[in-house]
Amino acid sequence: MSLLSKSKGEVTYKDLSGFHKWFLIVLVSMGSSIIYTPVYLKNVFYEPLMQGLGCTNADLGALLSCYAIVAVIAYLPSGIIADKVRMRTLSWVGFGATAVLTFIYAMLPSIQMLYVVFVGYGIISILIWWGTRFKIVRLCCSESDYASKIGVSYSIYGAAGLIVGLINTAIISAIADASQGIQILLVFLGVVIAVLGVLSFIFIPDFKGEIDKNTKLFSLSEVVTAIKHPGVIWACLAYFFVYLVYMGVTYTTPFMTTCFAAPVAIVSVVGLIRTYGIGLIAGPAAGFFADKLKSPSKSILIFFAASVIVLAAFMIMPREASMVIPIAVLVVLLGFVTYGAFSIGSSPLTEAKVPMSIFGTASGLLSVIGFLPDTFVHTWFGGLIDAQGADAFNTIFVALVVFAVLGCICLVMTRRAMKKNAAAEAESAN
């Protein structure tokens, strides 16, 4: 059977070949990694990007916060749009427009123009593209398979990010001038993202039931229904803390440079492994644990507990150059547990049995609340480093420990709400 998007009419996952389903999961999983790479370049190439743009720690944080503010506004309507517009349309348009913005970014414009570019990234990559990833994975499998499939999806996300990141590292390492290196890197990313747009246009089919043609584009009642669904709000708050800790861990990059005088090459490689490479095993491992424990929430609780232990180790270890390797190992370990939690962070929505009719809306709500940390954490932590230097990192790590504990509390409340709802349904059935 043909893979071409328009060759079959409307289909379900049962109508697609195994190869086609996995091709689509790979496509959107790669895309979810690469489409956001230009925005989050600082997570790996912190120093080269700051030099190339000629800005401060606070400037980098402010750019990302600007993006995040737009993103937070766009997350909920992105989920609603994902319930009303074809995945194929959202995917290829999102990729194509992001590629255009990346080519503008590659010109290294003024900081004022960069704010415009990052606002554009927020509108395009979130409002248009964001809802496609979770929903296409969900459309390509049964409800019971979602936790394991989204775990594998994050593994593919990690693999794609690692491969692209290694190419980016080679570009930065080969070119002495930081500005020129960043420009070439961004042009490369723009081309790759454009190719993903073409593939989406050709191969994503029209899924049966992916949109409801009889309802209006925006329905406040669907938002209210999603909010009222037992466990959804607690799951959203839990995801807020999962993402807050996950993003906070990116500051292990300047931590290694500032406190241990680690060479930029080592820091970049460790950053790549922490951000992408570890996902090759962390995503599937998290999905495996969730299946074995029969609860994504329990798995995330375990990952939170492990992250607290590693963060505590950061605070008590001596800050000497000889400790670079042990610290690098701990950074990778921390990347594993936080990535694992992040990779299945949306799974409590299926655990809460959110119906498909409002799944996109619930995912949008999860994103609005869950990704709020991007609006403040980068400016906050970047400002701390500018003001306090090496002393800022203990403050950052203490904050992350507190956030992990609060996340555990939210997960416990999520499970309580789900159990209470299940008991009520069982009682009404009898």
Where are the language model's segments positioned?
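Cytoplasmic helix-loop-helix junction between adjacent transmembrane helices
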Residues: 120-155
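Juxtamembrane intracellular "pre-TM" segments in multi-pass secondary transporters
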Residues: 3-18, 207-235
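Glycine-rich segments within core transmembrane alpha-helices of 12-TM secondary carriers
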Residues: 147-172, 367-377
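C-terminal membrane-cytosol helix-exit motif in multi-pass small-molecule transporters
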Residues: 190-211, 410-415
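Extracytoplasmic gate region of multi-pass secondary transporters
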Residues: 42-46, 161, 230-283, 342, ...
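Helix-to-loop junctions at the C-terminal end of transmembrane segments
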Residues: 74-86, 282-295, 385
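C-terminal transmembrane helical hairpin of 12-TM major facilitator-type secondary transporters
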Residues: 296-345
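Cytoplasmic membrane-interface "Motif A"-like loop-to-helix N-cap segments
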Residues: 84-95, 291-305
